[in-house]
Design a protein with these regions (language model features):
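Non-catalytic terminal regions with compositionally biased, polar/charged low complexity
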Residues: 195-196
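C-terminal capping/lid segments that line or modulate ligand- or cofactor-binding pockets
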Residues: 14-60, 76, 82-190
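An acidic, gly/pro-interrupted, aromatic-rich
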Residues: 66-75, 80
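N-terminal start-of-chain detector that recognizes signal peptides
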Residues: 9-11, 68-69
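Short amphipathic alpha-helical coiled-coil/interface segments
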Residues: 1-10, 113-116
Length: 196
């Protein structure tokens, strides 16, 4: 029921994206990567999911060398480059990556994982930091004062890249990917029996 409400109520057909609603019913103009979260919970129809993908590579919204900005690149808030206004957040990228994988968008998920890894490594190699958030234009972490240079969720950026090679989930077990055929070990056993 909730997924249906999300699909029917928050889908903005004219823009081809999920968006928040104003109190009077209209769609909020500003967008963020949370527009992709309906993929995570399985609320997007196949047609909606396909249209969402267009925004991942669109450099006026979420696309670019450093992704995913927390305000679209064409939003005036993006230029602020302050906290949730245009910065890249590792936890948000991770959630979008999970949603892409859930819908079988493996190429798009792999691209996001690679870009996220590159963003992390740029700052790790240059400054040995694992930052709270990042500039969506330059990829820099410490270009403004309210960013913590060491924050645990920074590890989600390379975790996505690792998940493209070796993955574990409670329901299906281990999956090891390579250039050949995937190796799957599972289902997993727990003290209560097999996990399904």
């Amino acid at each position: 029921r909730h997924r249906t409400l999300i699909s029917e109520t928050l889908w903005d057909e004219s823009r081809g994206i999920f968006a928040n609603r104003q109190r009077r019913g209209g769609f909020v103009r500003s967008l963020s990567p949370t527009s992709f979260y309906p993929l995570l919970c399985g609320a997007a129809t196949p047609a909606q999911a396909a249209r969402l993908l267009e925004h991942l590579s669109d450099e006026t919204t979420f696309g670019g060398d450093f992704v995913l900005p927390n305000a679209t690149r064409d939003d005036p808030a993006f230029a602020d480059n302050v906290y949730w206004r245009g910065r890249i957040w590792p936890n948000v990228n991770y959630m979008v990556w999970l949603g892409l994988r859930r819908y079988g968008f493996t190429a798009e998920a792999s691209k996001l994982a690679g870009q996220s890894y590159d963003l992390f490594m740029k700052n790790w190699r240059e400054d040995r930091i694992a930052s709270e958030n990042y500039n969506a234009v330059t990829g820099e972490a410490l270009d403004q004062g309210d960013t913590d240079p060491f924050y645990i969720w920074a590890a989600m950026l390379p975790l996505m890249a690792t998940g493209e090679i070796v993955e574990f989930d409670l329901w299906t077990g281990w999956t090891v990917r390579n250039t050949g055929r995937d190796l799957a070990l599972g289902p997993m056993l727990s003290p209560s029996g097999t996990l399904h």
